[in-house]
């Protein structure tokens, strides 16, 4: 496999495959519980729209026909972005959604493809009367944002990649083994241990609890189907992203030396940052630094000015 085809998330896959064969640690699903920090988080306008008859939940901060749209990752939800709302909403309109199958959105028995998720974003933007957006995608949110750009290029101002991938997750054999673990009755153990392995040193106990609660309450059919969606080779083309792209990645030894080159081959207007001392959930581990980096980049590119 060439460097161009190596995954930015090799760390995640390597750990996940190994963990699927490790001894299981039982983990019970638990509902999201409010914490003291909830009182300090600004309250957005909670709304619902529909896609193919299913309700999609989102929160809105501010007004205007352009917005920063925050897209969470696999088995996550809006809560992952709670430390971004206050800082970002001071500058521009912000929308965060629960992708279908996640959070407060409906969880129908459908195929959870990246295309389906992209259509959900378009439905939210249409309901919110947002004409164009900067899409910030964490983890799985990156291929979702890219698929949105493919389908709705005129509605895409720019993309922010948060420890996400622009290349395939792995060869079919690896992906089949990974997905098989999530089909098993012990899937919650595999998900919980996988999340623990990719969490960084600065992630608070409260944040870990919220991440685990979200993941372990995501229905199994969503967990499996969304991972199958990320394994779909059709979403990993070499087609260019011709809008500005900011990539904030967590440094780790599995990325290799050519990650920036790999990204730039697809996204010529790339601003690439590799951060030391963080894990996969960068925006939760170092929220102030993350927020400042995104705002600085938005300012530099004259995006979403009020």
Region locations from a protein language model:
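Bacterial N-terminal signal peptides that target proteins for export
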Residues: 2-16
């Amino acid at each position: 496999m060439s460097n161009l085809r190596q995954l930015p998330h090799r760390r995640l896959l390597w750990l996940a495959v190994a963990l699927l064969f490790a001894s299981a640690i039982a983990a019970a699903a638990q509902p999201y519980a409010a914490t003291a920090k909830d009182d300090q988080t600004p309250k957005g306008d909670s709304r619902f729209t529909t896609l193919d008859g299913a309700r999609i939940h989102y929160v809105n901060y501010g007004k205007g026909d352009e917005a920063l749209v925050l897209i969470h990752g696999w088995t996550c939800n809006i809560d992952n972005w709670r430390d971004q709302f206050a800082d970002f909403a001071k500058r521009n309109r912000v929308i965060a959604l629960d992708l279908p199958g996640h959070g407060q959105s409906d969880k129908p028995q459908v195929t959870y493809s990246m295309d389906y998720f992209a259509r959900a974003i378009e439905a939210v933007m249409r309901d919110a009367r947002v004409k164009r957006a900067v899409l910030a995608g964490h983890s799985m949110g990156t291929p979702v944002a890219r698929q949105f750009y493919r389908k709705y290029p005129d509605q895409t101002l720019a993309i922010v990649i948060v420890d996400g991938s622009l290349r395939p997750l792995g060869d079919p054999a690896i992906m089949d083994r990974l997905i098989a673990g999530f089909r098993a009755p012990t899937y919650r153990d595999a998900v919980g241990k996988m999340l623990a392995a990719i969490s960084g040193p600065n992630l608070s106990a409260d944040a870990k609890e919220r991440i685990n609660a979200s993941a372990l309450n995501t229905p199994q059919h969503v967990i499996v189907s969304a991972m199958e969606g990320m394994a779909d080779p059709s979403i990993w083309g070499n087609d260019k992203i011709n809008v500005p792209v900011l990539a904030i990645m967590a440094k780790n030894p599995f990325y290799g030396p050519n990650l920036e080159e790999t990204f730039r081959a697809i996204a010529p207007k790339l601003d690439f940052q590799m951060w030391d001392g963080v894990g996969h959930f960068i925006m939760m581990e170092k929220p102030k630094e993350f927020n400042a980096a995104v705002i600085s980049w938005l300012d530099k590119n004259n995006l979403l000015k009020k």
